[in-house]
Amino acid sequence: MPPKKTETKAADASAAAAPAPAAAPTSAPKTKSPSTHASYLDMITDAIVALKDRAGSSRQALKKYVRANNTLGNVTDNMFDSLFNKALKNGVDKGVFEQPKGPSGGTKLAKKVAKPAPKKAAPKKETKEKKPAAAKKEGAAKKETKEKKAPAAKKAAAPKKAAAPKKEVKEKKAAAPKKKAAAPAVADKETVLTKTKSGRVAKSTAKPAAAKKAAAPKKAAASKKAEKAEPAAEKA
């Protein structure tokens, strides 16, 4: 029995040393061959332009043109019909194609409606340029007001020239008393005491020098009368 155990161990070791079976080779990814034709939408558009049917080209006529003028490769009839119908429907939905009589009628290109040109907004730079112009106008107005104020100040200063004659008037008024003082002073009239016949003393104002000269003889006569009157008084 013990020899059997050794045999089993040797068999296990040989099995472990044996190389593992090689994995199956993976298949290379399938690459799609590039299409040698345009999209179905473009091919249908070219067919409509080439056929030039005013009422619209039929579906069968379009299919024949697409097959005859494009290399579609290994495409089955069923695949071609599904791709063609799908492209035609998408073109109608997008507004590229037009079917006036419905899906069973002819197909033609939709008329392009000219879109109105968007209105251009007024440039904002013009408003920015106008503001400095307004500021300049305000500055010019301020300068004009300043210039106007300056002549007003000059006009206010003008009365100073008119004030000069007042000094001359004052000087003339002050000079007026001098003229009065320069006038010859009136001499006080001299009073002369004379005695009347009754013996009373009478006061009389003296006349000017010329008058005094004329009155001189009268004084002599008066003195004679006084001398005569004194002896008479002594006798009495």
From Swiss-Prot:
GO terms for molecular function: double-stranded DNA binding; nucleosomal DNA binding; structural constituent of chromatin. Its main location: nucleus. One of its GO terms (cellular component) is nucleus. Residues 1-10, 123-150, 165-174, 224-236 have a biased composition (Basic and acidic residues). CDD domains: H15 (cd00073). The keyword DNA-binding applies. It is found in: Nucleus; Chromosome. SMART domains: H15. It comes from the Eukaryota. Gene3D superfamilies: Winged helix-like DNA-binding domain superfamily/Winged helix DNA-binding domain. Residues 11-36, 153-162, 202-220 have a biased composition (Low complexity). The keyword Coiled coil does not apply. Keywords: Chromosome, DNA-binding, Nucleus. It holds the Pfam family Linker_histone. Residues 36-111 form the H15 domain. Residues 109-122 have a biased composition (Basic residues). Residues 1-36, 94-236 are annotated as: Disordered. GO terms for biological process: chromosome condensation; negative regulation of DNA recombination; nucleosome assembly. Could act as an H1-type linker histone. Belongs to the histone H1/H5 family. This is Histone H1. It comes from Neurospora crassa (strain ATCC 24698 / 74-OR23-1A / CBS 708.71 / DSM 1257 / FGSC 987). The gene is hH1.
